[in-house]
Protein backbone atom coordinates (compact mmCIF):
# COMPACT_ATOMS: atom_id res chain seq x y z
CA UNK A 1 0.00 0.00 0.00
CA UNK A 2 1.29 3.51 -0.76
CA UNK A 3 2.30 5.65 2.19
CA UNK A 4 1.54 9.24 3.15
CA UNK A 5 4.52 11.58 3.38
CA UNK A 6 3.97 14.89 5.16
CA UNK A 7 6.43 17.77 4.92
CA UNK A 8 5.33 20.36 7.40
CA UNK A 9 5.26 22.13 10.71
CA UNK A 10 5.64 20.86 14.26
CA UNK A 11 4.54 23.06 17.15
CA UNK A 12 4.00 22.88 20.86
CA UNK A 13 0.78 24.69 21.75
CA UNK A 14 0.84 26.57 25.05
CA UNK A 15 -2.78 27.34 25.97
CA UNK A 16 -3.41 29.83 28.77
CA UNK A 17 -6.70 31.10 30.16
CA UNK A 18 -7.36 34.32 32.06
CA UNK A 19 -10.20 36.69 32.90
CA UNK A 20 -8.89 39.18 30.37
CA UNK A 21 -5.83 39.56 28.19
CA UNK A 22 -3.14 41.99 29.36
CA UNK A 23 -2.86 45.46 27.90
CA UNK A 24 0.54 46.68 26.65
CA UNK A 25 2.92 46.91 29.60
CA UNK A 26 0.53 45.11 31.95
CA UNK A 27 0.83 41.80 33.79
CA UNK A 28 -2.31 39.83 34.66
CA UNK A 29 -2.84 36.65 36.63
CA UNK A 30 -3.66 33.59 34.54
CA UNK A 31 -5.99 30.78 35.55
CA UNK A 32 -4.83 27.64 33.70
CA UNK A 33 -2.08 26.51 31.38
CA UNK A 34 -1.96 23.41 29.19
CA UNK A 35 0.51 22.04 26.67
CA UNK A 36 -0.45 20.17 23.52
CA UNK A 37 0.96 18.99 20.23
CA UNK A 38 0.14 21.05 17.17
CA UNK A 39 1.31 22.53 13.91
CA UNK A 40 -0.64 21.78 10.74
CA UNK A 41 1.91 19.25 9.56
CA UNK A 42 1.87 17.29 12.81
CA UNK A 43 -1.92 17.33 12.96
CA UNK A 44 -2.29 16.06 9.40
CA UNK A 45 0.30 13.33 9.85
CA UNK A 46 -1.32 12.01 13.02
CA UNK A 47 -4.78 12.18 11.43
CA UNK A 48 -3.50 10.04 8.54
CA UNK A 49 -1.68 7.56 10.78
CA UNK A 50 -4.76 7.01 12.92
CA UNK A 51 -6.60 5.92 9.76
CA UNK A 52 -4.23 2.96 9.50
CA UNK A 53 -1.73 3.94 6.80
CA UNK A 54 2.05 4.21 6.93
CA UNK A 55 3.11 7.83 7.42
CA UNK A 56 6.55 9.44 7.19
CA UNK A 57 7.23 13.01 8.32
CA UNK A 58 9.75 15.56 7.05
CA UNK A 59 10.40 18.55 9.30
CA UNK A 60 12.54 20.00 12.05
CA UNK A 61 12.43 20.35 15.82
CA UNK A 62 14.82 21.89 18.30
CA UNK A 63 17.17 20.11 20.64
CA UNK A 64 14.83 20.96 23.50
CA UNK A 65 12.12 19.40 25.65
CA UNK A 66 9.38 20.40 23.20
CA UNK A 67 11.28 18.63 20.43
CA UNK A 68 11.63 15.50 22.55
CA UNK A 69 7.90 15.55 23.28
CA UNK A 70 6.98 15.98 19.61
CA UNK A 71 9.14 13.02 18.56
CA UNK A 72 7.63 10.88 21.31
CA UNK A 73 4.13 11.87 20.19
CA UNK A 74 4.88 10.90 16.60
CA UNK A 75 6.29 7.54 17.64
CA UNK A 76 3.31 6.85 19.91
CA UNK A 77 1.03 7.41 16.92
CA UNK A 78 3.05 5.34 14.46
CA UNK A 79 4.43 8.23 12.41
CA UNK A 80 7.92 7.66 11.00
CA UNK A 81 10.48 10.20 12.19
CA UNK A 82 13.49 9.45 9.98
CA UNK A 83 12.85 12.71 8.12
CA UNK A 84 12.80 14.91 11.23
CA UNK A 85 16.06 16.76 11.84
CA UNK A 86 17.14 18.29 15.17
CA UNK A 87 18.40 21.86 15.14
CA UNK A 88 19.81 24.37 17.61
CA UNK A 89 16.81 26.60 16.87
CA UNK A 90 13.87 26.14 19.23
CA UNK A 91 10.92 23.92 18.36
CA UNK A 92 8.00 25.80 16.82
CA UNK A 93 5.63 27.17 19.45
CA UNK A 94 2.16 28.69 19.52
CA UNK A 95 1.13 30.71 22.57
CA UNK A 96 -2.65 31.00 22.90
CA UNK A 97 -4.31 33.36 25.38
CA UNK A 98 -8.04 32.84 25.95
CA UNK A 99 -10.10 35.27 28.03
CA UNK A 100 -13.37 34.73 29.92
CA UNK A 101 -15.45 35.54 26.84
CA UNK A 102 -13.57 32.85 24.85
CA UNK A 103 -11.85 35.47 22.70
CA UNK A 104 -8.30 34.41 21.92
CA UNK A 105 -5.01 35.99 20.97
CA UNK A 106 -2.33 33.81 19.40
CA UNK A 107 1.38 34.28 18.88
CA UNK A 108 3.03 31.72 16.57
CA UNK A 109 6.81 31.37 16.57
CA UNK A 110 7.86 29.28 13.52
CA UNK A 111 11.40 28.74 14.86
CA UNK A 112 12.69 25.37 13.55
CA UNK A 113 9.81 25.13 11.06
CA UNK A 114 11.32 28.03 9.15
CA UNK A 115 14.52 26.04 8.58
CA UNK A 116 13.01 23.01 6.84
CA UNK A 117 15.02 22.88 3.61
CA UNK A 118 15.00 20.99 0.29
CA UNK A 119 18.02 19.02 1.54
CA UNK A 120 15.85 17.58 4.33
CA UNK A 121 13.65 15.88 1.73
CA UNK A 122 16.34 13.32 0.90
CA UNK A 123 15.76 11.49 4.19
CA UNK A 124 12.52 9.90 2.95
CA UNK A 125 12.17 7.83 -0.23
CA UNK A 126 9.18 8.65 -2.43
CA UNK A 127 7.63 5.73 -4.32
CA UNK A 128 4.96 5.54 -7.03
CA UNK A 129 1.48 6.03 -5.58
CA UNK A 130 2.65 7.77 -2.40
CA UNK A 131 0.53 10.71 -1.23
CA UNK A 132 2.60 13.85 -0.51
CA UNK A 133 1.05 16.44 1.80
CA UNK A 134 2.20 19.92 2.77
CA UNK A 135 0.92 23.28 4.06
CA UNK A 136 2.12 26.89 4.18
CA UNK A 137 3.91 26.60 7.54
CA UNK A 138 7.33 25.73 6.11
CA UNK A 139 9.33 27.62 3.44
CA UNK A 140 7.65 27.76 0.03
CA UNK A 141 10.88 26.71 -1.75
CA UNK A 142 10.90 23.49 0.26
CA UNK A 143 7.26 22.75 -0.58
CA UNK A 144 7.97 23.33 -4.28
CA UNK A 145 10.97 20.98 -4.22
CA UNK A 146 8.94 18.38 -2.30
CA UNK A 147 6.15 18.39 -4.85
CA UNK A 148 8.47 18.37 -7.87
CA UNK A 149 10.30 15.38 -6.42
CA UNK A 150 7.05 13.63 -5.57
CA UNK A 151 5.46 14.05 -8.99
CA UNK A 152 8.66 12.91 -10.70
CA UNK A 153 8.52 9.73 -8.60
CA UNK A 154 4.88 9.05 -9.47
CA UNK A 155 3.33 10.39 -6.27
CA UNK A 156 0.14 12.41 -5.79
CA UNK A 157 0.57 15.89 -4.28
CA UNK A 158 -1.89 17.46 -1.84
CA UNK A 159 -1.45 21.08 -0.74
CA UNK A 160 -3.42 22.57 2.12
CA UNK A 161 -3.00 26.26 1.23
CA UNK A 162 -3.18 27.43 4.83
CA UNK A 163 -2.58 29.86 6.27
CA UNK A 164 -3.51 32.10 3.33
CA UNK A 165 -0.37 33.91 2.15
CA UNK A 166 0.45 36.45 -0.53
CA UNK A 167 3.81 35.02 -1.59
CA UNK A 168 2.83 31.62 -3.01
CA UNK A 169 4.60 31.37 -6.39
CA UNK A 170 2.40 30.49 -9.35
CA UNK A 171 4.85 27.75 -10.31
CA UNK A 172 3.99 25.96 -7.06
CA UNK A 173 0.30 25.69 -7.95
CA UNK A 174 1.18 23.82 -11.15
CA UNK A 175 2.74 20.96 -9.16
CA UNK A 176 -0.34 20.52 -6.97
CA UNK A 177 -2.66 17.63 -7.84
CA UNK A 178 -5.23 18.28 -5.10
CA UNK A 179 -5.55 21.71 -3.49
CA UNK A 180 -7.50 21.93 -0.22
CA UNK A 181 -8.75 25.30 1.05
CA UNK A 182 -11.43 26.58 3.39
CA UNK A 183 -13.81 29.39 2.43
CA UNK A 184 -11.50 32.15 3.65
CA UNK A 185 -8.48 30.75 1.82
CA UNK A 186 -10.55 30.12 -1.31
CA UNK A 187 -11.65 33.75 -1.42
CA UNK A 188 -8.12 34.98 -0.76
CA UNK A 189 -6.46 33.03 -3.55
CA UNK A 190 -9.33 33.34 -6.04
CA UNK A 191 -9.56 37.09 -5.50
CA UNK A 192 -13.30 36.99 -4.82
CA UNK A 193 -15.44 37.12 -1.71
CA UNK A 194 -16.73 33.72 -0.61
CA UNK A 195 -19.12 34.24 2.33
CA UNK A 196 -20.01 31.37 4.63
CA UNK A 197 -23.44 31.06 3.03
CA UNK A 198 -22.22 31.23 -0.57
CA UNK A 199 -24.16 29.04 -2.99
CA UNK A 200 -22.46 25.84 -4.12
CA UNK A 201 -22.21 27.10 -7.70
CA UNK A 202 -20.42 30.24 -6.48
CA UNK A 203 -17.98 28.15 -4.43
CA UNK A 204 -17.33 25.89 -7.42
CA UNK A 205 -16.73 28.84 -9.73
CA UNK A 206 -14.24 30.36 -7.28
CA UNK A 207 -12.49 27.01 -6.89
CA UNK A 208 -12.03 26.63 -10.64
CA UNK A 209 -10.21 29.97 -10.70
CA UNK A 210 -7.39 28.28 -8.78
CA UNK A 211 -6.70 25.61 -11.39
CA UNK A 212 -3.47 25.98 -13.34
CA UNK A 213 -3.45 22.85 -15.50
CA UNK A 214 -5.69 19.95 -16.61
CA UNK A 215 -6.13 17.17 -14.11
CA UNK A 216 -6.11 19.31 -10.97
CA UNK A 217 -8.74 19.05 -8.24
CA UNK A 218 -9.70 21.80 -5.80
CA UNK A 219 -11.43 20.80 -2.57
CA UNK A 220 -13.19 23.50 -0.55
CA UNK A 221 -14.05 22.65 3.05
CA UNK A 222 -17.24 24.42 4.10
CA UNK A 223 -17.42 23.85 7.85
CA UNK A 224 -20.80 22.54 8.97
CA UNK A 225 -21.94 22.47 5.33
CA UNK A 226 -19.43 19.74 4.43
CA UNK A 227 -17.06 19.93 1.47
CA UNK A 228 -17.09 20.50 -2.27
CA UNK A 229 -14.58 19.36 -4.88
CA UNK A 230 -14.26 20.48 -8.48
CA UNK A 231 -12.29 19.37 -11.49
CA UNK A 232 -12.37 21.04 -14.87
CA UNK A 233 -15.65 19.34 -15.77
CA UNK A 234 -17.05 17.68 -12.64
CA UNK A 235 -18.21 18.51 -9.13
CA UNK A 236 -18.53 16.48 -5.91
CA UNK A 237 -20.52 17.62 -2.89
CA UNK A 238 -20.30 15.95 0.52
CA UNK A 239 -22.86 17.21 3.07
CA UNK A 240 -21.78 18.07 6.60
CA UNK A 241 -22.70 16.25 9.81
CA UNK A 242 -24.49 18.00 12.65
CA UNK A 243 -22.47 17.69 15.86
CA UNK A 244 -21.95 19.72 19.02
CA UNK A 245 -18.54 21.28 18.36
CA UNK A 246 -16.33 22.22 21.30
CA UNK A 247 -13.05 23.02 19.52
CA UNK A 248 -12.63 23.47 15.76
CA UNK A 249 -8.86 24.05 15.92
CA UNK A 250 -7.77 20.91 14.10
CA UNK A 251 -10.83 20.23 11.93
CA UNK A 252 -9.26 21.23 8.62
CA UNK A 253 -6.07 19.34 9.39
CA UNK A 254 -8.07 16.24 10.31
CA UNK A 255 -9.88 16.46 6.97
CA UNK A 256 -6.64 16.77 5.00
CA UNK A 257 -4.83 13.95 6.81
CA UNK A 258 -7.80 11.60 6.64
CA UNK A 259 -8.35 12.41 2.96
CA UNK A 260 -4.71 11.58 2.19
CA UNK A 261 -4.96 8.32 4.13
CA UNK A 262 -8.02 7.12 2.26
CA UNK A 263 -6.51 8.05 -1.10
CA UNK A 264 -3.46 5.98 -0.16
CA UNK A 265 -5.80 3.11 0.69
CA UNK A 266 -7.31 3.26 -2.79
CA UNK A 267 -10.52 5.23 -2.30
CA UNK A 268 -11.81 7.37 -5.14
CA UNK A 269 -12.04 11.06 -4.26
CA UNK A 270 -15.77 11.10 -3.34
CA UNK A 271 -15.37 8.19 -0.91
CA UNK A 272 -12.20 9.68 0.56
CA UNK A 273 -13.97 13.02 1.07
CA UNK A 274 -16.89 11.38 2.85
CA UNK A 275 -14.54 9.54 5.21
CA UNK A 276 -12.52 12.71 5.86
CA UNK A 277 -15.69 14.69 6.53
CA UNK A 278 -16.81 12.22 9.20
CA UNK A 279 -13.34 12.24 10.76
CA UNK A 280 -13.34 16.04 10.99
CA UNK A 281 -16.81 16.02 12.54
CA UNK A 282 -15.47 13.80 15.32
CA UNK A 283 -12.37 15.93 15.88
CA UNK A 284 -14.42 19.08 16.58
CA UNK A 285 -16.18 17.35 19.48
CA UNK A 286 -12.85 17.12 21.33
CA UNK A 287 -10.50 19.68 22.80
CA UNK A 288 -7.08 20.03 21.20
CA UNK A 289 -5.48 19.57 17.81
CA UNK A 290 -3.16 16.59 17.33
CA UNK A 291 -4.66 14.82 20.34
CA UNK A 292 -8.20 15.16 18.93
CA UNK A 293 -7.71 13.11 15.76
CA UNK A 294 -10.02 10.05 15.64
CA UNK A 295 -9.09 6.48 14.77
CA UNK A 296 -10.30 4.62 11.70
CA UNK A 297 -12.64 2.49 13.83
CA UNK A 298 -14.26 5.61 15.27
CA UNK A 299 -14.83 7.04 11.81
CA UNK A 300 -16.13 3.80 10.30
CA UNK A 301 -18.59 3.40 13.18
CA UNK A 302 -20.30 6.62 12.07
CA UNK A 303 -19.96 6.15 8.32
CA UNK A 304 -22.97 5.01 6.32
Model-derived segments and spans:
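Short, conserved phosphate/pyrophosphate- and ester-handling motifs at nucleotide-, phospho-/glycolipid
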Residues: 48, 182, 252
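Glycine-rich phosphate/adenosyl-contacting loop at the front of the ribokinase-like
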Residues: 1-60, 65-69, 75-76, 245-246
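Hydrophobic residues at beta-strand termini and immediately following loops
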Residues: 58, 107, 238
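Aromatic/hydrophobic pocket-lining residues that form π-stacking "cages" and hydrophobic walls in ligand
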Residues: 44-45, 70, 145-148, 279
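Ribokinase/PfkB-type carbohydrate-kinase core domain
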Residues: 1-10, 72-86, 96-235, 298
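Conserved phosphate-binding/catalytic region of the ribokinase-like
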Residues: 1-4, 166, 197-304
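Short acidic/glycine-enriched loop/turn segments that link adjacent beta-strands
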Residues: 89-92
